[in-house]
Amino acid sequence: MAQQTPLYEQHTLCGARMVDFHGWMMPLHYGSQLDEHHAVRTDAGMFDVSHMTIVDLHGSRTREFLRYLLANDVAKLTKTGKALYSGMLNASGGVIDDLIVYYFTEDFFRLVVNSATREKDLAWITQHAEPYAIDITVRDDLSLIAVQGPNAQEKAATLFTEEQRNAVEGMKPFFGVQAGDLFIATTGYTGEAGYEIAMPNEKAADFWRALVEAGVKPCGLGARDTLRLEAGMNLYGQEMDEGISPLAANMGWTIAWEPTDRDFIGREALEMQREKGHEQLVGLVMTEKGVLRNELPVRFTDAQGNQQEGIITSGTFSPTLGYSIALARVPAGIGETAIVQIRNREMPVKVTKPVFVRNGKAVA
């Protein structure tokens, strides 16, 4: 039986088409995925992301533990509320999960991890935390709503108390603050400004209804996927998994190689991959008719004249751009063009950086 978030009833009242998403009943859309997508790019939309797992870590050695657990280095986190994006890797350098870590005090950090990987994440964290005497608290008492879009922060702020408005005023991206009963973070998965707001489960339904009244459009998983793909953001299980290195998933920037004496899980394997060479994640654009889909082959000829083949990890029609885009994992050495086999047709595609839209504007 699929689980329900505390907002399940609100979704049905808003006319959602519900689907089973990794064991959770979640809204796919509320009538028009396209309208929801455009609302986030031009105004404000919101997503129920309560299926994600919030994990609080307490203990005097928490920073030391996270410097070993994560490929990125929490030594960078010195300001209260600052957040960091990182991969959590296995010994062979594969990605167990990608997550966000927040720093509050030396003995209090918070992780937000994916729903599909919840059980293995918690088992892995618990296993490696034991020598550090870390107290692990899974915050199933909290719901999480993402409010995204150019007008999202302004509309969300109409629900805040004066204390909460003061707390978030001037807050830069990738920070979080606990203000009253809300945890408000300037993070998201759309390429737009906004907040991800955690609150007690019993407050979630009222907060959702108030956002609707403030003119924030409910959005489902469908729009969430097209928005994150336009923004060039990875989806666990597609761009990366336990068999795929962050180096092959455009996550090289999340690996903190310095200081060289910091040992983290997967470091040795990554250093070998970096030396030998590895696949890369690129963007693809196809302006001709048709849609680039997951798992289609991508072929190109490298500089040595060798035929090479990669694979599309995520592909869709981009509502913002009006043509098809994709992320693809390919051997190193790809040029500016490639060929994608769509049914029995060989379609030319342009190779770009793996990001297409930022703050509503085309970048590809």
Curated annotation (Swiss-Prot):
Its EC number is 2.1.2.10. It catalyses: N(6)-[(R)-S(8)-aminomethyldihydrolipoyl]-L-lysyl-[protein] + (6S)-5,6,7,8-tetrahydrofolate = N(6)-[(R)-dihydrolipoyl]-L-lysyl-[protein] + (6R)-5,10-methylene-5,6,7,8-tetrahydrofolate + NH4(+). One of its GO terms (cellular component) is cytosol. Pfam families: GCV_T, GCV_T_C. Keywords: Aminotransferase, Transferase. One of its GO terms (molecular function) is aminomethyltransferase activity. InterPro entries: GCS_T, GCS_T_bac, GCST_C, GCV_T_N, GcvT/YgfZ/DmdA, GcvT/YgfZ_C, TrmE/GcvT_dom1. The keyword Transferase applies. SUPFAM superfamilies: Aminomethyltransferase beta-barrel domain, Folate-binding domain. GO terms for biological process: glycine decarboxylation via glycine cleavage system. Belongs to the GcvT family. The glycine cleavage system is composed of four proteins: P, T, L and H. The glycine cleavage system catalyzes the degradation of glycine. This is Aminomethyltransferase. It comes from Salmonella arizonae (strain ATCC BAA-731 / CDC346-86 / RSK2980).
